[in-house]
Amino acid sequence: TRMAQNGCDVTCYNRAGHHVSGAEYDKTIEYDGIRQKVVPTIEKKGLAAVSSSFFAALCSAFGRYDVVHIHAEGPAFFCWIPKLFGKRVISTIHGLDWAREKWKFGVGSKFIRQGEKNAVKYADEIIVLSKDVQKYFLETYGRETHFIPNGVNRPEVREAKLITDHFGLEKDSYILFLGRLVPEKGIRYLVEAFKNVKTDKKLVIAGGSSDTDSFMEELKELAKGDDRILFTGFVQGAMLDELYSNAYIYT
């Protein structure tokens, strides 16, 4: 959004289907100066990301853009398409996705790993979010990358209002975990450990799944019987600010 505020013409390609923030956002075509365009998507697990990434790469190749910025290793599989049409390509690697538990075996892992290799081969520049991943690319491929950690806005401190109305939470009454509910984040260990702690604090697990609905169900089954453990689902905006502002501790 700051690029748009500084005069850049920014377009974001998004997959079809309901917006993660809710169906009321489905028809939003502009956000803080950024145009959003929806690309065709095969609505089937394992194909939604692949198909939308392909069509986004194809559309960007034919668009009047100076730079095409591709995020994550899977979508980077198609970075050769805009490159073929003379676009300058930037790839941001958010992590070694092929090593994640949900992709560890089978075709998905191989596809994502090839996306990593394509980024190395075709991207003009690669951005990484951690020193460890930067070291990995240098040692594995001899490829220099740019280490740019994710930036955050300074959160606004808010009193507990929405979280009290929706979840019965008050200031310092809970421990907060916030993130995608995926196995490699170790959430099952957090739940198991918390169940053995004698405290009147609650454990709030805030976040949605990422093609990991079965893991979410596993977590809920693991938490069954302990009414101190609360799953909020995906949160954002004022609700998110309140969760941060009023947590006893968070991880």
Where do the model's predicted regions map?
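A short helix/loop element that forms part of the nucleotide-sugar donor recognition site in Leloir-type
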Residues: 24-26, 157-169
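Nucleotide-sugar donor phosphate/pyrophosphate-binding loop at the beta->alpha transition
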Residues: 51, 88, 99-118, 158
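Conserved donor-binding/catalytic core segment of Leloir-type glycosyltransferases
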Residues: 127, 168-198, 203-204
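An aromatic- and histidine-rich active-site surface loop
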Residues: 47-61, 65-98
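Nucleotide-activated donor-binding/catalytic signature segment of Leloir-type glycosyltransferases, i.e.
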Residues: 216-242
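Membrane-proximal helix-turn-helix segments that form the acceptor-binding/catalytic region
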Residues: 58-61, 84, 107-126
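Carbohydrate-associated surface elements
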Residues: 132, 151
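Acidic donor-binding loop of glycosyltransferase active sites
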Residues: 124, 245-251
